[in-house]
């Protein structure tokens, strides 16, 4: 396995709760895809699931950023270009589109390993970019 990048992020659930209380869940329309919003809204504790998705997106961005000091906007990667999905066995997965997918291809990414965890206090995500052996 050839590791091309790693990213980690932590989001406090209380911050997401406060944003929802202040501005409503619609504030996340610019950050989450329709499928992500639908999933989060279907859960008993939407803020926790929003928080873990935001952490996952940021972890993937950090991994894609690599040694570059560029920000998301400088790389041209939008929040909705990194989507957290679930594979058939229920494990979290990542789908990249647009600039995010182009960046991954340019780095030689063949697979993104994602680990998510959350409590009622915090959500954490770790993303590992994997290239082909020998890259």
PLM regions: where:
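Core catalytic alpha/beta fold that binds nucleotide/phospho-ligands
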Residues: 1-135
